[in-house]
Amino acid sequence: MPELKIKTEKVEKQLTKEPLVLKTPKEKIDNLGKFYATGKRKNAIARVWLKVGKGKIVVNKKTIAQYFPSETYVKTILKPFVLTKTIDQYDIICTVRGGGISGQKGAILHGISKALDKSAPDFHAILRKGGLLTRDSRVVERKKYGQRKARKKTQFSKR
């Protein structure tokens, strides 16, 4: 019984301490008025700067049409602007590293969505409902020894 009393006294002391005050993080806005966010997908990491402009999109010092050969990639990257009805209202500058084209596309999409969310809090519900603010955490499964691929096995013979 004395051990239980000591433990309850410790818990009571912890409860009577002053509550922790959580600091709200500062919005990532630089001195030029750009909203900054990072996006990730597979092995790709994108750094995105968003500012009010005319709809110009630059990826690694190239236009989006030069960087992504397929038009479907461009359409998916512009999805946050279509949902929020802000096409041609923001200029985007982004740098992307790692992964392939599909992973880089997903990273840019995630970064743009996060930057748009910071620029106007009204967009949060729209972007969340569209599933653009959640990171797609799917990555390639590793190859196991004794198998041909991650899941594919060699042909089994009973005899």
From Swiss-Prot:
SUPFAM superfamilies: Ribosomal protein S5 domain 2-like. Pfam families: Ribosomal_S9 (PF00380). GO terms for cellular component: cytosolic small ribosomal subunit. GO terms for biological process: translation. InterPro entries: Ribosomal_Su5_D2-typ_SF (IPR020568), Ribosomal_uS9 (IPR000754), Ribosomal_uS9_bac/plastid (IPR023035), Ribosomal_uS9_CS (IPR020574), Ribsml_uS5_D2-typ_fold_subgr (IPR014721). Disulfide bonds: none annotated. One of its GO terms (molecular function) is structural constituent of ribosome. Keywords: Ribonucleoprotein, Ribosomal protein. Belongs to the universal ribosomal protein uS9 family. HAMAP family: Ribosomal_uS9_B. This is Small ribosomal subunit protein uS9.
